[in-house]
């Protein structure tokens, strides 16, 4: 989990647009966030296995 101070800092609008970055909306993780789902890879995997993300299923071939 991310620190509360870092999550609060990320919510503020930065002075320059290039300073914006994505964070997972569920846990606050700053790395490996899928923009389409706004989730990090770990949260995405957990929710996908539970079937809570519509249209996503485990690949099998």
Curated annotation (Swiss-Prot):
Zn(2+) binds at residues 24, 27, 40, 43. Gene3D superfamilies: 30s Ribosomal Protein S14, Chain N. One of its GO terms (biological process) is translation. Binds 1 zinc ion per subunit. One of its GO terms (cellular component) is small ribosomal subunit. Its cofactor is Zn(2+). Pfam families: Ribosomal_S14. InterPro entries: Ribosomal_uS14 (IPR001209), Ribosomal_uS14_bact (IPR023053), Ribosomal_uS14_CS (IPR018271), Ribosomal_uS14_sf (IPR043140). Part of the 30S ribosomal subunit. Contacts proteins S3 and S10. Binds 16S rRNA, required for the assembly of 30S particles and may also be responsible for determining the conformation of the 16S rRNA at the A site. This is Small ribosomal subunit protein uS14. It comes from Bacillus cereus (strain ATCC 14579 / DSM 31 / CCUG 7414 / JCM 2152 / NBRC 15305 / NCIMB 9373 / NCTC 2599 / NRRL B-3711).
